[in-house]
């Protein structure tokens, strides 16, 4: 009888635990057809769908003087959202506005290449609050 009770208690303690989903690693690079004229800030943002709305789940800022920029970002399962992930990168110079942008949908792959498209005002774009 004590064995049956011990067996029942062990089942209750163990339960139906499932291992957590592993973190997802997104590896990629940011490129641009034009060279950088000075040190730039590059923000790589990841967006996910939450409650029917697209929301930023992670942003990483890099500072570089050369492209391509190689990156590796780790997303934990809570950051994954309800479906597809989207990536956006922006390039800006200190004290200036956004100079170039790239966007891409992440579809079942962890390796991405974001090709920055310079704005027509590159490399002299101003942000609205620095004029």
Swiss-Prot record:
GO cellular component: a single term: cell outer membrane
Localization annotation: Cell outer membrane
Lipid moiety-binding region (N-palmitoyl cysteine): 16
Lipidated residues (S-diacylglycerol cysteine): 16
Domain of life of the organism encoding this protein: Bacteria
Record's protein name: Type 3 secretion system pilotin
NCBIfam families found in the cross-reference section: YscW (TIGR02567)
Primary location class: membrane
Family: Belongs to the ExsB/YscW family.
Membrane topology recorded in Swiss-Prot or TrEMBL: Lipid-anchor
Subunit structure: Interacts with YscC/SctC.
Knockout-associated phenotype: In mutant, only a small amount of YscC/SctC is properly targeted to the outer membrane. Mutant is Ca(2+) independent for growth at 37 degrees Celsius and secretes smaller amounts of Yop proteins.
Function field: Involved in the synthesis of the type III secretion system (T3SS), also called injectisome, which is used to inject bacterial effector proteins into eukaryotic host cells. Pilot protein that is required for the proper localization of the secretin YscC/SctC in the outer membrane. Also required for efficient oligomerization of YscC/SctC and stabilization of the oligomers.
Assigned keywords, A-Z: Cell outer membrane, Lipoprotein, Membrane, Palmitate, Plasmid, Signal, Virulence
Signal peptide per UniProt: 1-15
């Amino acid at each position: 009888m004590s064995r049956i009770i011990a067996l029942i208690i062990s089942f209750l303690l163990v339960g139906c635990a499932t291992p957590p989903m592993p973190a997802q690693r997104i590896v990629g690079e940011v490129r641009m057809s034009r060279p950088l004229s000075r040190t730039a800030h590059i923000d790589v943002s990841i967006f996910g769908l939450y409650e029917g709305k697209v929301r930023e789940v992670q942003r990483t800022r890099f500072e570089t003087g050369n492209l391509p920029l190689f990156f590796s970002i780790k997303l934990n399962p809570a950051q994954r959202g309800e479906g597809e992930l989207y990536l956006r990168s922006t390039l800006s110079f200190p004290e200036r506005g956004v100079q170039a942008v790239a966007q891409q949908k992440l579809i079942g792959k962890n390796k991405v290449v974001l090709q920055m498209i310079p704005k027509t005002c590159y490399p002299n774009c101003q942000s609205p609050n620095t004029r």
